[in-house]
């Protein structure tokens, strides 16, 4: 997959900008003001993603559900046996968030995971591997 940070890293390595997350990044991809190449992404529905992943034999782990206020959906998917795990360990989870996610894993026999906050070195707020 090609992400904005990958594009910017290549431009930075070529000497075409002085930082991965600098003025050029804001000009191209910024939210306020809107970047010149940023467009509204059309995401598939949750049901479509689940069906595609399951058809491919994937293990479905819901990453950082508390960050995006997705706990009602996580509770539903866990109860229905649709997901296989929940990311419990995440830098932005409060102790209460961790406790609720861990309890759901225990209740429904789900995998207890962590580590999706590591996005490599090209991130505004880098987190070490495993966070």
Please identify what each model-predicted range represents.
Residues 1-76:
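Extended substrate/RNA-proximal surfaces in nucleic-acid metabolism proteins
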Residues 50-51, 55-59, 66-131:
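Charged catalytic cores and adjacent phosphate/nucleic-acid-binding surfaces used
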């Amino acid at each position: 997959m090609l992400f904005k940070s990958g594009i910017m890293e290549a431009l930075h390595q070529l000497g075409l900008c002085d930082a991965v997350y600098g003025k050029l990044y804001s000009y191209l991809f910024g939210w306020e003001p809107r970047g010149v190449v940023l467009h509204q992404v059309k995401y598939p529905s949750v049901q479509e993603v689940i069906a595609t992943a399951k058809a491919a034999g994937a293990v479905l782990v819901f990453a950082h559900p508390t960050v995006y206020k997705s706990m009602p959906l996580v509770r539903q998917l866990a109860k229905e046996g649709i997901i296989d795990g929940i990311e419990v360990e995440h830098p932005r989870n409060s102790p209460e968030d961790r406790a609720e996610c861990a309890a759901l894993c225990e209740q429904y026999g789900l995998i207890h995971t962590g580590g999706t906050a590591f996005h490599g070195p090209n991130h505004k707020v880098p987190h070490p591997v495993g966070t």
